[in-house]
């Protein structure tokens, strides 16, 4: 397993991490088996969120006795200091840990990011928690390119998480800017929320970009983990055949895949089209149709 330094945090993490959304559909014992398999294979970065129902709780059980071997990241949708402080304490309890390595502001559109940074905003609680040793570092996750651009200019941002995959590569220049500014870049949605079925080609594509610090595919069983490990541990250049597969995937999804650019807005019926598409992509890993 290749390891990278997660930007300004200085944390040494595996090139592939563990995305904690799919474990909502298994159980605590299944999560424990996955955690031990991660440890055996050198995967040391785990991502979850307050909003992922039982994910934090399952991970807290699954990491019993081995917590110190992992870099643990979670996130909250809270925008005020009071709500964020409560969420940090809940995360600590759920994850059965005295500290969380990386705590992230979850999916903040530009207007919310301004609230987070304002007096009484969530950043106050995150900074206080960092001073108290409850969390180690502060990051942000986003689906908006404008949020990504804004985050790059904020001195307190140590990591940025954003969708990046074969069909969603519109942030490539911003990802390169992360590398130049020593901001860790975390690639989420490497399979485009399940739209890309060829996981090996998808992960190989993401890891071919040297500016990506870590990719975090979701996994619900050992078979998925083994498949993802084989892809990420293959450091050979992309082959002509793989490049052809990538073009075919882009062609197949290019006219129907939502990139959340919002060029389709405003909707005459008042529907947030990109929000609906995002909800569908989030439901897919949970087995919802």
Please provide the spans of the model-predicted regions.
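Conserved residues at the C-terminal ends of beta-strands
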Residues: 19, 49, 103-106, 141, ...
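Short hydrophobic/aromatic-enriched beta-strand-loop microsegments
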Residues: 69-72, 157-165, 236-242
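Alpha-helix-loop-beta-strand connector modules within alpha/beta enzyme cores
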Residues: 56-75, 123-132, 180-182
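Glycine/proline-rich, positively charged
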Residues: 26-29, 36, 40, 79-186, ...
């Amino acid at each position: 397993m290749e390891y990278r330094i997660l930007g300004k945090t200085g944390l040494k993490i595996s090139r592939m991490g563990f995305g904690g959304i799919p474990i909502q559909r298994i159980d605590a014992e299944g999560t424990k088996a996955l955690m031990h398999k991660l440890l055996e294979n050198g995967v040391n970065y785990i991502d979850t969120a307050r909003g992922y129902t039982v994910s934090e709780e399952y991970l807290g059980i699954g990491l019993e006795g081995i917590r110190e071997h992992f870099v643990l990241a979670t996130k909250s949708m809270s925008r005020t200091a009071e709500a964020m402080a409560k969420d940090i304490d809940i995360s600590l309890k759920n994850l059965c840990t005295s500290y969380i390595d990386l705590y992230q502001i979850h999916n903040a559109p530009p207007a919310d990011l301004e609230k987070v940074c304002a007096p009484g905003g969530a950043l106050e609680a995150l900074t206080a928690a960092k001073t108290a040793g409850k969390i180690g570092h502060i990051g942000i996750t986003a689906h908006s390119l404008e949020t990504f651009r804004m985050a790059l200019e904020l001195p307190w941002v140590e990591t940025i998480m954003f969708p990046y995959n074969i069909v969603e590569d519109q942030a490539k220049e911003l990802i390169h800017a992360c590398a130049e500014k020593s901001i860790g870049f975390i690639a989420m949605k490497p399979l485009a929320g399940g739209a890309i079925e060829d996981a090996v080609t998808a992960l190989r594509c993401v890891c071919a970009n040297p500016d990506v610090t870590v990719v975090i595919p979701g996994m619900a069983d050992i078979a998925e983990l083994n498949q993802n490990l084989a892809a990420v541990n293959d450091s050979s250049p992309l082959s002509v055949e793989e490049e052809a597969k990538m073009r075919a995937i882009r062609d197949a999804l290019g006219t129907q895949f939502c990139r959340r650019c919002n060029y389709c807005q405003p909707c005459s019926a008042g529907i947030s089209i990109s929000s609906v598409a995002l909800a569908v992509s989030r439901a897919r890993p949970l087995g919802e149709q």
